[in-house]
Amino acid sequence: FINPSIKDIKLSKMLDTDCVEIHTGKISNLIKSKKNYINELNRIKNSSVLANKYNIEVHAGHGLDYKTTKILNKIKEIQEFNIGHFIIGEAVFIGLSKVIKNFKKIIRN
């Protein structure tokens, strides 16, 4: 994980990294607590754009669920979402197949 910051993306470039996973815990907590998350969303967007410019593949993860993934999916530079914990937890209640179908709908839109 790296923080969604220009500094961390530049350091990743200096280290010749080909892929980063942006930590989305802060935005996930802000969204879940119904607080303003726009500044954090902009940090993630700006970091993702710069990483893409540097040809660094961008992944995102930590605290993701349906709502947070739908919001972050608007950032086209993010190529992968790591949502394992929520998927398994939700599958206990509605089944793995249904959870996967729900996420496919979110990501395809």
Predicted feature locations:
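Active-site beta-loop-alpha junctions enriched in small/polar residues
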Residues: 3-5, 25-27, 56-57, 61-67, ...
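Glycine- and other small-residue-rich loops at beta-strand/loop junctions that grip anionic moieties
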Residues: 1, 40, 61-62, 92
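C-terminal helical cap(s) of enzyme catalytic domains, especially alpha/beta-barrels
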Residues: 32-37, 89-109
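Histidine/lysine/aspartate-rich catalytic loop segments that bind and position anionic ligands
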Residues: 1-50
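N-proximal accessory regions
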Residues: 44-62, 104-107
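Glycine-rich phosphate-binding active-site loops on the catalytic face of alpha/beta enzymes
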Residues: 19-31, 77-96
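Catalytic cores of alpha/beta
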Residues: 5-15, 60, 64-78
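Electropositive phosphate-/nucleotide-binding environments in soluble metabolic enzymes
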Residues: 6, 41, 66, 93-97
